[in-house]
Amino acid sequence: MTTAAASWSPQPEGLAELVELFRQSTSTEREVQRRIAHRLDAISQIPDYLNYLVLVFVQMTGEEVSTRSVAGLLAKNHLYFNAPRVSPESLAFVQHMILPALSFSDTVLRNVATQIIAVLMQVVKPVNWIDGLSTLTQAMDSSDLNEAEAALSTFAKISEDMPEELDACEIQGMRPLDVLIPKLLHATAHADARIRVHALNSLNQFIQIGSPSMSANMDAYVAVLFQRATDERPIVRKFVCKALVYVLSTWPEKLAPDMNSVVEYMLYSTQDSDEDVALEAAEFWLQFAEEPRLSEQLRPNLPRIIPVLLKCMVYSELSLLMMGDIQDDAAEPDRPEDIRPRHYGGTMHRSERDDEAQGSGHKSRAAIDADFDDDDEWDDDELDDDLDDEAGSWNLRKCCACLLYT
């Protein structure tokens, strides 16, 4: 840390005011919220505003989790939206302060810490934050399960945000990914499902860009995918299916020797009771159909694939109820747009889905967290959202229709 950053200390009055604003931020009164937002907007103009936020988040352990998490989220947003205005001294201060937060005992605070570190890595770049990469790498092997999970979660976020920059990073002639890829492969067998998912999610980012570090470990990765194919957690199987799609599009020759087994697995997974797993498996057939090098292997399997796709196209009872008021137009001739799927082509559609996730606050990462929520209760809003998804979003039925059109 620079001398200026090391010698920084807050003004007591300013720190006290900020903490009080964060305490009040839980109020539901509109006028209180308006006043807090106005005051924070004014305070955010001071040069060391970020230092105050990180100090409250990391060091003020006597405050409520809600108070500290507000400070942390504001720090993350300030970094993300105002990076050019943040001084090198403030960046150095945050780099020094934030890494110990990976071992916070509170889940909310740890999650906020992972977000701050991921954004900070985007701002300063991996090659300029060797300590950050080194700490994450070491923490992945921590005996503290929470710290290890936080480190893997952070690296998954960074991998999603900047895979090319991680791949290009060299430090004193060494590529960090040459060390990290084997470590991630090992983590896919971890007893904790969260860690398995973070590892698979990270590795998938480097498959997509054709990373040399990934290429050197592809045989090991394909073996890992086969090992995790029957994982008890649907979200792990979802990432296995996603990985197989990426391998098929990038290194199809790696699957060729075991293609019969892969086909059997994907047929089974396309009928998985978890629709997220089934949808990812269905994407595999889209990629399969578009890969001319595999046409000879696809053709003999069509008699088994097509009935599965037709079965998956059947409307659910809920969908039929939703369409009950739609006018019957069976006597009217179909237009081309009625027949041709709106999302056509596996590669194109996957790009749309990836862009959607990146442009909407990292939905994929939020989905990972949501899938570990054991609360199966639905409220009315969640049911409405589900109905909207069925009506308008890409789903298993539409994917299978697209496949048959292909």
Roles of regions detected by a PLM:
Residues V124-S213:
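Solenoidal tandem-repeat scaffolds enriched in leucines and small polar residues
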Residues G14-V19, Y49-M60, E64, R85-L102, ...:
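HEAT/HEAT-like alpha-solenoid repeats
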Residues A4-A5, I306-C402:
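Acidic, serine/threonine- and proline-enriched intrinsically disordered linkers and terminal tails
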Residues T2-L53:
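N-terminal alpha-helical scaffolding segments that mark the starts
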Residues G62-I117:
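Eukaryotic helix-linker segments that join adjacent hydrophobic helices
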Residues S25, L40-S44, L74-N82, I116-V123, ...:
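Hydrophobic residues within the alpha-helices of tandem HEAT/HEAT-like
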Residues A5, E20-E31, V58-T67, M97-L109, ...:
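Short coil/turn segments at helix-helix junctions and helix-capping linkers
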